[in-house]
Design a protein with these regions (language model features):
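Conserved core of the sugar-phosphate nucleotidyltransferase
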Residues: 1-75, 79
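A generic structural signal for short hydrophobic patches within well-formed alpha-helices
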Residues: 77, 81-82, 141
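Conserved active-site beta-strand element of glycosyltransferases/polysaccharide synthases
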Residues: 123-127, 134
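Catalytic, metal-anchored helix/loop core of enzyme active sites in primary metabolism
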Residues: 149-161
Length: 163
């Protein structure tokens, strides 16, 4: 087979951002059939009183609707994806070392986006209505702990999951 079939869990942006600072999110574009057609990794996405926006330069901000689908890097790949990453890593490394060796990051969504553009992969987006809980900042921890406790009390997680 010449193409790969992958899966991604998509969340609503508004259910994934913190009140305590910026986050990185893969902003997704899908077609009418639930397939990913593009993904742009935005490394400075923030809530503000008027909604949610991102910036690339710290000066110019772009609003993003709260219901925009985003990737939280929950992917379903086949083993061939590792070969694709291995083939693409040298070019990334050359560029990262030249441009920003301290902060260079090989984003999985970039490789996926390249594969989609090359017509080598199809990604089905499985949408989740749930809120994403994560600790990006220390101030996020109390709400995450409370949410995990509530979901345990509701039976969504077994008591003693971490024992």
């Amino acid at each position: 087979k010449d193409t790969y079939d992958y899966y991604m869990v998509g969340y609503e942006l508004g259910k994934t951002v913190t009140d305590h600072g910026s986050v990185a999110r893969g902003i997704c574009v899908t077609d009418g059939k639930g397939h990913l057609t593009g993904i742009d990794e935005r490394t400075r996405v923030e809530k503000y009183p008027g909604g949610i926006h991102f910036t690339e330069d710290g000066e110019h901000w772009v609003d993003v609707p709260a219901d925009t689908t985003v990737s939280m890097n929950l992917w379903g790949y086949t083993p061939g994806f590792l070969k694709e990453l291995e083939a693409r890593f040298p070019a990334f490394l050359d560029k990262a070392l030249a441009e920003n060796p301290i902060k260079g990051e090989f984003f999985l969504p970039l490789a996926v986006s390249q594969l989609i553009g090359e017509k080598k992969a199809t990604v089905t987006v499985l949408t989740s209505p749930d809120k994403w809980y994560g600790v990006t900042y220390a101030a996020d921890k109390p709400a995450v702990v409370a949410a995990l406790r509530r979901m345990t009390d509701e039976g969504k997680y077994p008591d003693g999951l971490w024992k």
